[in-house]
Amino acid sequence: MKKIIAIVLVCICVLGIVGCSQQPQQVQGGLLLAEGNVINIDVSSLPEGYNYSFSGADAKAIIDYLSTLNLESNFEENPNEYDGMTWVISLKYENGDALTIYHFGNMFIRVKGGSCYKMTYDEASRFDTLLDELK
């Protein structure tokens, strides 16, 4: 009887450890965006220094970039521990709504007031390349 209880306790412990560990969950960047037609995108930096405005095909290129990101919702890193410049991406929709996205630390992105997601360094650096092409 003691063996059975010991085995059950070990199984419960193993299941608890496996079930409680944070497994990376992949999500698409499109979840960051609201439904609707974007008419303008302003991109600025924190600290201040850069300020761009895009519409038409250039705005679509930024939306395509954001939509195709492969994001991770569970990660070990603490975004608050990463320094560096933050891109502030402000989308203006045809219906008057606005959405602000923060792209920072060369690996994190979040919607204002929303959850933080992790992306690969390669995906994050693609935004800098895209801005260089569009400006």
For the regions a language model picked out, list residue spans one by one.
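Hydrophobic helical h-region of N-terminal Sec-dependent signal peptides
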Residues: A6-V14
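C-terminal motif of bacterial Sec signal peptides marking the signal peptidase cleavage site
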Residues: L15-G19
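Function-determining sites in protein domains
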Residues: C20-K135
